[in-house]
Amino acid sequence: MKILLTGFEPFGGDDKNPTMDIVEALSERIPEVVGEILPVSFKRAREKLLKVLDDVRPDITINLGLAPGRTHISVERVAVNMIDARIPDNDGEQPKDEPIVEGGPAAYFATIPTREIVEEMKKNGIPAVLSYTAGTYLCNFAMYLTLHTSATKGYPKIAGFIHVPYTPDQVLEKKNTPSMSLDLEIKGVEIAIRVAQSALHSSQLR
């Protein structure tokens, strides 16, 4: 079973993105995981993500993103076919009111077991919630493209997106901004992978 786990480069003036550390840690810890870091660029992220999906042909894909201001790990349920960039990407581009895929469905639902993932995280002491908006920036963009590839090409078999909060070192100069330890974020994403693996394995046995 092949699992593609993606994160993003830093953006929006931050000098780090914890998803890079999560991807690195779990790529080393879980043999089935292939880790990739996507650029915060609508043009380059599209090119890289679609190429990686074609090259790896994963059974499971979980895209990760940083959500400044969120208090919990957020397991996203839906991606919409809309780009409405609130800030420029790292190439200085700021597209608005554009579809991700011309003529594509208005939205896709995550196909990983989102509720089960959240419940398992909570059982392990990790603050987690279901989320119904992945935004209209690069995170939603990656989630939609992955699910569109799944729907049109058959791989990955299941996919979804997880947002993580800032880590404590990122909020030292940001008053009243929530954070979560990197270790807890890594543990949460590892749980998500294990739950997704189990769900896919069970479905293949039916």
Swiss-Prot record:
Its EC number is 3.4.19.3. InterPro entries: Peptidase_C15 (IPR000816), Peptidase_C15-like (IPR016125), Peptidase_C15-like_sf (IPR036440), PGP-I_bact-type (IPR029762), PGPEP1_Cys_AS (IPR033694), PGPEP1_Glu_AS (IPR033693). It is an enzyme of class 3 (hydrolase). GO terms for cellular component: cytosol. It is found in: Cytoplasm. Keywords: Cytoplasm, Hydrolase, Protease, Thiol protease. It catalyses: Release of an N-terminal pyroglutamyl group from a polypeptide, the second amino acid generally not being Pro. Its main location: cytoplasm. PROSITE patterns: PYRASE_CYS, PYRASE_GLU. Coiled coil: none annotated. GO terms for biological process: proteolysis. It comes from the Archaea. The active site is at E76, C139, H163. GO terms for molecular function: pyroglutamyl-peptidase activity. CDD domains: Peptidase_C15 (cd00501). Pfam families: Peptidase_C15. Homotetramer. Removes 5-oxoproline from various penultimate amino acid residues except L-proline. Belongs to the peptidase C15 family. NCBIfam families: PRK13194.1, PRK13197.1, pyro_pdase. This is Pyrrolidone-carboxylate peptidase. It comes from Pyrococcus horikoshii (strain ATCC 700860 / DSM 12428 / JCM 9974 / NBRC 100139 / OT-3).
